[in-house]
Amino acid sequence: MILMTLGVLQLPMPLAMSMPGGKPILALALVGMPINVLSTDTIGKILAGGASVCNTAGIPIAGGHTIDSVEPIYGLVVLGLVHPDRVKRNDGARVGDVMVLGKPIGVGVLSAALKKEVLDAAGYESMISNTTKLNTPGPELAELNGVHALTDVTGFGLAGHALEIARGAKLTAYIKWSDVPLLPNVPALLKSGNVTGASGRNWDGYGKEISLDSGVPAECQALLSDPQTSGGLLVTCSPETVPEVLAIFKRHGFHDAAIVGHIGEAQKSRLIVNA
């Protein structure tokens, strides 16, 4: 067995833990709080939230480190085990692989709406539910021989992490936009101007590698690069493995898991998005 470490940094957002193929065994908490600004009650709730997620994952917080910080920071270093033969990287995709996404996207749009105080209770609940849902299918997916690449969609958005898969395999990824699951009310909120600055910076960084079909809606660009807090797992697998992959997601309660594209031979663009 080899040791696996996963760093998870969260600001004032729900804590979530990614487990793309390994089994976590313990966590160390890294805490920085403005002690002259936040009450001990608020800090206690943040710590309790982290402990709750670790309890759900079945691991203890075995220690950690605290500092006085200008901004609130809470994170975990997670230690775990994974068999060397079952390490799933983001560079193993093969031509003909199907891409499956475990969670809907749009967290960045919802968080932008929250900051502007235009997010309703239902939208807030969907954001919290999505971001606090642990990616528990990871270890089971890693056991499947037909799964060739595995990563989680986080700060670089769906496009950024699909690009990482395509670059790593020296192939081209295809996304069918109409099949990408979105969190409720995200398109309407986006049209109202609720977008993060990170989305634009992401696109500035990698947009030149992406080709958008003429039928793709205008909001697609901002959502493809929308940063996700605790986004879903992005899997590439052989076509015959797809039913088992989807069944694993469903069994873990990921009912929005969907086929979003495929992997093809290398083209001029590393990522091609069709309507």
Regions found by a protein language model. Give the residues of each.
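Glycine-/charge-enriched secondary-structure boundary and capping motifs
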Residues: 1-9, 35-37, 42-60, 67-74, ...
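Non-catalytic interaction surface on structured domains
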Residues: 120, 141-144
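Glycine-rich phosphate/pyrophosphate-binding loop regions near the starts of catalytic domains
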Residues: 1-125
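Active-site loop/helix belt of alpha/beta enzymes
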Residues: 129
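A short, well-structured juxtamembrane/interface segment
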Residues: 133-140
